[in-house]
Amino acid sequence: MGCGNSTAASAGAGQGPAGAAKDVTEESITEDDKRRNYGGVYVGLPSEAVNMVSNQTKTVQKN
């Protein structure tokens, strides 16, 4: 459900027989995916971090 990175990781473990199990695995991972780090981009940001990012972008836009 969602990111191609999560499906690629589970498909790499077992492409053939894991086809049916992959759907079940994805459903159980969805909550975990929200907290995972994809190549430096954190998916489940807390509100404090969102405020920090928005403040940084405002500063950059002023320059």
Curated annotation (Swiss-Prot):
Q: Which Pfam families match?
A: OCC1
Q: Which organism is it from?
A: Bos taurus
* Gene that this polypeptide is encoded by: OCC1
Chain segments annotated as coiled-coil in the UniProt record: none
Cite the record's Low complexity compositional bias ranges: 1-12
Membrane spanning residue stretches: none
Where is the segment annotated Disordered?
Answer: 1-40
Similarity annotation: Belongs to the OCC1 family.
What protein name applies here? Overexpressed in colon carcinoma 1 protein homolog
